[in-house]
Amino acid sequence: MAEALGAQELYEKMFEQRFTANDKEYQEYLKREQDQPPIVEDWKMGNQRNTDRYRDNRHHRGWDGRQNWSSNSYNQSYGRGGWGNSYNQYRQDRHNYQQGHYTHNPSNQRFHSDRY
């Protein structure tokens, strides 16, 4: 403990004039011209359209402006997904995938892969 106090006192003595008017190196640093910030050109990958993930892309929704494809009356009345609806198929495939490759461990509530 005494060595730690001695080291602390040593460093305080070494750096007591740091960043003051008596610190010649720091004063030279303050006198130098500031660096210009870097200029980054084409940071949005040039002229590629529809790459903004925050854009909602309304022009891809369909000819009649339906916003929720999985709950329209066409798909519900015929009971077979209809045109343009693969949501239930995706969920079924995903469910089978999770059952095939992952097991649930109730002791720590995490999924463990049997692939490794």
From Swiss-Prot:
Residues 31-116 are annotated as: Disordered. Residues 56-116 are annotated as: RNA-binding. A motif (RNMT-activating domain) lies at residues 36-42. It comes from the Eukaryota. Residues 67-78 have a biased composition (Low complexity). GO terms for molecular function: enzyme activator activity; RNA binding. Residues 1-55 are annotated as: Interaction with RNMT. It holds the Pfam family RAM. Keywords: mRNA capping, mRNA processing, Nucleus, RNA-binding. Residues 97-110 have a biased composition (Polar residues). One of its GO terms (biological process) is 7-methylguanosine mRNA capping. Regulatory subunit of the mRNA-capping methyltransferase RNMT:RAMAC complex that methylates the N7 position of the added guanosine to the 5'-cap structure of mRNAs. Promotes the recruitment of the methyl donor, S-adenosyl-L-methionine, to RNMT. Regulates RNMT expression by a post-transcriptional stabilizing mechanism. Binds RNA. Belongs to the RAM family. This is RNA guanine-N7 methyltransferase activating subunit. It comes from Xenopus tropicalis (Western clawed frog).
